């Protein structure tokens, strides 16, 4: 999560958002996710990344390079769930719908869940956990949501042999608007959603009614709560913006946390029985002996699962606080790590930490892509991990063995009293970085000689010793910054070409550590994500984008890129600027090659195409996966800052994206779900 500004006259303000077993049970063969007992049907999209492993690849090929120019809008749905206002009240539609059970399922920033007809976009049912305002028909949020801005998706489970009762229940509930006061009797197909209030909801996928057996042991009707269990640390619970994951008969749900509080609540990951809601296991990235000294390490991003090997893959974040770790100078090997858990017990099978003693907010930002790649002439079951640093790590899925070497590289030390930076960081070898990682004085950018000179003067005043330069009292340049490099949803695999398509941002931030005058400094409210009191530490942090007086980034463009990495050779096959800056009706010409800061990510299809929105210019693009050539684009009402998806009904392929803008980026805001298809 981050806020920055990028603008002035032609480039106005911009901000980018980037989030011990207690019991066990054997996997029930009768109750598994649809993809656990068979491959995902070609026309379905059953998890955030299409399949449980999160490949972000569709095997559909009806739309291809020859006909993509003919794509047209098939339908548009508007939920009404948006607030066109600045942060913190403005919304950001980041959802990726599922297509399964003959419906499209998605969530909104106001916590509602919709089921749509995939051919027409008409509503089948709506679940609203809030009471509804009588005048507007919209959720009446009282009290207002703590973070009413993001919901990236929902999860799906079904019994292996659902009964014929579905047809009757679905027919009776067509067009129904469910609330958390209803109850569904059957629930042999379930939609799971993380709520804003520590809850995990279970809904009947046919009707939208809550599954009354889920959470019944705790006295709930259709939901469970993390608050019902032991939680270490201080402060409020964080919200969860990403969907749960389903593996066998458990649903795995995580929480975010307050990383500006030294002993924040720990970011627990819990697995619940899909039917009863009973706790199966829980996982805490913080070692037990340190649970009351540090907190916040969590999994705010998406989770992937390996059905074949019964593994859950977690991308964990930094512990609290961001930017200063003087109070947590002890070993925590499961933070800033890819962690593979046994799906039945929740015990760690293997882990690999990729950031040591994080002082940079280098959270792991996206689910590991669990895909079969070609490397060294053989097919390998891989777990691919993109990072904010612009590094791509690859591991053998069942053992954690690196697929390309990782070496410990010496990095700059901290000069902040009380701090001690890690002496080395693990750097992969043999795989090209997908983002810019170095910055020199001569590279600094400016629209005019005057603002370029201003960037150079600022550069001379600040500390910059290359990558992993820690924050300092003097002020340090962090590049890549916590904006990325990579970020959530940012990578998609194409099995036909063995290419990983991955987007990046190339922006730097300035971070200054300031000693607190007294305890009252802890009570100063945060200005934004980069300027905060760091409660419980002797310092506060002030941060901003590294930019000129004109509000233009000092880092050289392109500020947003899309790259194809050849996983066999480790080299970039192609790289292009992604999108254009657009603000106040002005779009920077494509030929400038500046690219655009971006939120969201790509998908690939068997038609040889990469589809991506994500950019400030409100365009939805189709790129030739093998060459990087743009083949088609369509203008969206507002930016599509989400991961798109593709599905098929009756032999017809659709490509869909959520276009809702992003309040943290300062774009226009909306509530559009737009499907495209070839004309009949």
What residue spans do the PLM features occupy?
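Long, low-complexity segments enriched in small/aliphatic residues
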Residues: 429-509, 517-518, 561-564
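Extracytoplasmic/lumenal domain signature
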Residues: 66-82, 113-146, 156-173, 200-235, ...
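Acidic, proline/glycine-rich low-complexity intrinsically disordered segments
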Residues: 45, 52-53, 75, 79-81, ...
């Amino acid at each position: 999560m981050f806020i920055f500004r990028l603008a002035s006259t032609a480039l106005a303000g911009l901000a980018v958002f980037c989030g011990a077993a207690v019991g066990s049970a054997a996997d029930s063969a009768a109750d598994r996710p649809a993809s656990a007992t068979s491959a995902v049907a070609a026309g379905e999209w059953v998890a955030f990344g299409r399949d449980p492993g999160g490949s972000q690849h569709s095997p559909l090929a009806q739309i291809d390079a020859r006909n993509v120019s003919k794509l047209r809008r098939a339908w548009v749905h508007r939920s009404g769930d948006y607030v066109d206002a600045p942060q913190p009240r403005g919304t950001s539609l980041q959802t990726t719908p599922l297509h399964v059970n003959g419906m499209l399922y998605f969530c909104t920033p106001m916590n509602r869940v919709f089921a749509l007809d995939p051919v027409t976009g008409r509503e089948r049912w709506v679940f609203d956990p809030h009471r509804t305002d009588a005048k507007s028909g919209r959720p009446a949020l009282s009290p207002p949501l703590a973070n009413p801005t993001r919901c990236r998706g929902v999860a799906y489970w079904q019994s292996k042999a659902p009964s014929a009762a579905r047809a009757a229940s679905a027919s009776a509930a067509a067009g129904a608007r469910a609330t958390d006061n209803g109850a569904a009797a059957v629930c042999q197909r379930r939609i799971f959603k993380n709520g804003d209030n520590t809850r995990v909801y279970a809904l009947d996928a046919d009707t939208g009614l809550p599954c009354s057996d889920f959470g019944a042991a705790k006295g709930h009707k259709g939901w469970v709560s993390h608050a019902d269990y032991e939680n270490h640390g201080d402060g409020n619970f964080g919200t969860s913006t990403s969907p749960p994951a389903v593996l066998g008969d458990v649903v795995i749900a995580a929480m975010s946390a307050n990383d500006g509080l030294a002993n924040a609540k720990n970011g627990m990951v819990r697995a619940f029985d899909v039917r009863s809601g009973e706790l199966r296991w829980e996982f805490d990235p913080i070692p037990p002996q340190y649970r009351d000294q540090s907190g916040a390490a969590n999994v705010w991003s998406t989770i992937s699962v390996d059905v074949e090997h019964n593994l859950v893959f977690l991308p964990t974040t930094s512990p609290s606080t961001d930017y200063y770790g003087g109070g947590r100078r002890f070993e925590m090997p499961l933070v800033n790590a890819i962690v593979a858990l046994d799906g039945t017990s929740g015990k760690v099978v293997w882990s690999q930490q990729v950031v040591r003693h994080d002082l940079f907010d280098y959270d792991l930002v996206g689910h590991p892509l669990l895909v079969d790649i070609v490397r060294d002439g053989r097919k390998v079951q891989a777990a691919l991990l993109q990072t904010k640093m612009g590094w791509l790590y690859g591991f053998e899925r069942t053992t954690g063995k690196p697929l390309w070497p990782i070496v410990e590289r010496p990095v700059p030390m901290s000069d902040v009293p009380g701090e001690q930076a890690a002496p080395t960081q693990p750097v992969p070898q043999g795989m090209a970085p997908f983002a810019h990682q170095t910055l020199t004085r001569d590279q600094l950018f400016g629209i005019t000689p005057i603002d370029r000179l201003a960037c150079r003067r600022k550069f001379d005043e600040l500390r910059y010793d290359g990558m992993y330069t820690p924050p300092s009292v003097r002020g340090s340049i962090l590049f890549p910054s916590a904006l990325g490099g990579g970020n959530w949803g940012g990578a998609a695999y194409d099995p036909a070409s063995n290419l990983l398509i991955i987007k990046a941002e190339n922006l730097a931030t300035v971070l200054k550590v300031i000693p607190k005058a007294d305890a009252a400094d802890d009570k100063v409210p945060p200005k934004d994500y980069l300027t905060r009191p760091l409660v419980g530490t002797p310092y506060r942090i002030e941060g901003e984008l590294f930019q000129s007086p004109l509000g233009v980034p000092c880092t050289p463009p392109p500020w947003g890129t899309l790259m194809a990495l050849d996983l066999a050779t480790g080299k970039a096959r192609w790289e292009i600027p992604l999108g254009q800056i657009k603000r106040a009706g002005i779009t920077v010409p494509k030929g400038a090659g500046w690219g655009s800061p971006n939120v969201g990510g790509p998908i690939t299809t068997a038609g040889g195409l990469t589809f991506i929105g994500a950019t400030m210019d409100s365009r939805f693009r189709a790129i030739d996966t093998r060459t990087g050539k743009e083949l088609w684009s369509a203008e969206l009402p507002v930016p599509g800052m989400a991961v798109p998806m593709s599905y098929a009904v009756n032999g017809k392929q659709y490509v869909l994206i959520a276009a809702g803008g992003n309040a943290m980026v300062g774009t226009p805001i909306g509530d559009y779900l737009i499907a495209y298809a070839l004309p009949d």
